[in-house]
Amino acid sequence: MSKTTRKTTDMGWPDLDALWMYNVLPEPFLSSELSRLSLANSIGDTDVVTFQPCPNPDVSNEDRFIVKDWSLPNGTWSFRAIFDGRRSRVLDLPFQLNQLLGHAGHETVDYVASNLPNTIQNALAKVVHHNNAPDASTISNVLTSTIASFDEDIGKALLTLFPDPEALAKLSDKEIRDIINDGANSTTILRCMLGSTVLISLVNPSRTSLWIASLGDCAAGMTKCSMGD
């Protein structure tokens, strides 16, 4: 077995007064492990990797990626997205969510990955149905408004559980606890307590225009491949 060196890091958070252990792997073992953990794959013309080397299942990978080619009336649109689940550092609740115990924070990112792409596709389909060649600003508005509306709907779902503040004030602690821990209700609450970044790229059928939508601490980079590289 290859010899490894163990070191510590503060992960860039010196104020937390905590250190994490990690192993410095030599080559070729480093490349071998990176290849094994990255789950490298190709989907059509898109190459993807995703990895979280931490072995603790409670902090398993919260990244999700979506690769879709949408056949719409004016041609095929290329949709690519990355969603990264986010956890609040402080979850200060007067009532403990049963589902939160041992929770890794996947509810929101799973919901976003499963539903936001289809929501954007439907909104885009309506636009190109009426205008076969929408201008760039129209597509930008579709992305912006759809993402904003989707985010608002997550919050509205929570408010439907307690629509009347006066009625809520009259509920006992047990009654509130029973509501928030009632099956789907706890998932609705967790989606608001947790979160997800959004990074989307969209290319039109003629491949002449590219749109990028970014929400949260994520960024997209663009490069150009030379012939033979």
Functional labels for PLM-detected ranges:
Residues M1-D229:
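PP2C/PPM-type serine/threonine phosphatase catalytic domain
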